[in-house]
Amino acid sequence: FQMQELHRQYEDYCIELGIESYLLGARYSKFGYYGESFFDVKYRALEEEQQLTETLFQFLTSMTMREIKLQDEELLFESCQQFIGLWWQEGYEKGERRYRLKLH
């Protein structure tokens, strides 16, 4: 039971940060709609995106029950970056589509 509860906490927090990242991308999509390139918008949001990545990484490393090797830690950080980045991009694309369709 305890392990199942721990997994649920991991899932809930990951989902929460995925949603935050999605909403962040959607919020920044207005800049893309008004003509900024995707990469310029991504750079504009970089600090907030990095904060979400750091938050997720810190949570996952603080919840482990064993010492993490440096190599594993680097892989985990990269996974956190990809997770946050993919949800940011998904939110950005959907948000830009909403702007084009005048649904904002």
Residue map of PLM features:
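Intrinsic-disorder/low-complexity detector
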Residues: 1-104
